Amino acid sequence: MTQKAKNTIYLLILIILSMLCLVYASVPLYSIFCKVTGYGGTVRTATVTQSKLGKTTIKIRFNADINKELPWKFYPEIPYTTVKPGEQKLIFYRAENLTNEYVSGMAVYNVTPYKVGKYFNKVACFCFTKQTLSPYQKTIMPVSFFIDPNIETDPETSDVKLITLSYTFFKYKETTK
């Protein structure tokens, strides 16, 4: 085999390995990108609320879905609320384990319209951690959030009057290494 053929094989192997590494890293990198930019309706997390209150009132609709593998009931206590940008709100979802076994779930979330994701900030949420319910247990799950007042000055979002906060609960599957 010539040196040129060997170099071509090495180059192809390097390209394939690079592509595999990129595929492996793409999900966490995309997740980080979405959290930083608010892209795709990804909500930001915050530890402190805004001190400035906005002028407009925005209606927040709450949605709850469950993957068919999770034997729970899951729903918001209220279907919607209103909030002024900068005002912190606390709302609750309810969950119930419908089985006689311990079951763990993990919630994923987003907001629509997607363009407001970067302005929707969660202070506290059940979605940050795995939730485990004992047999037939009912529980209340809090969500504390606020809308960044800058939503009013952004030409892309200044006309938004309705935001939907949506959760989907999935059965938590333990992974072994």
Curated annotation (Swiss-Prot):
InterPro entries documented for this protein: CtaG/Cox11_dom_sf, Cyt_c_oxidase_assmbl_CtaG
Record has Isomerase as a keyword: no
Membrane topology: Single-pass type II membrane protein
Keywords from the UniProt entry: Cell inner membrane, Cell membrane, Copper, Membrane, Signal-anchor, Transmembrane, Transmembrane helix
GO cellular component: plasma membrane
TM helices/strands, residue ranges: 9-29
One biological process term in Gene Ontology: respiratory chain complex IV assembly
Cytoplasmic topological domain: 1-8
Top-level lineage group: Bacteria
Topological domain ranges for the Periplasmic compartment: 30-177
Annotated signal peptide: none
Gene3D superfamilies: Ctag/Cox11
GO molecular function, one term: copper ion binding
Subcellular location as annotated: Cell inner membrane
NCBIfam families in alphabetical order: PRK05089.1
Described purpose of this protein according to its UniProt entry: Exerts its effect at some terminal stage of cytochrome c oxidase synthesis, probably by being involved in the insertion of the copper B into subunit I.
Family: Belongs to the COX11/CtaG family.
Name of the molecule in the record: Cytochrome c oxidase assembly protein CtaG
Organism of origin: Ehrlichia ruminantium (strain Gardel)
Lineage, highest ranks first: Bacteria, Pseudomonadati, Pseudomonadota, Alphaproteobacteria, Rickettsiales
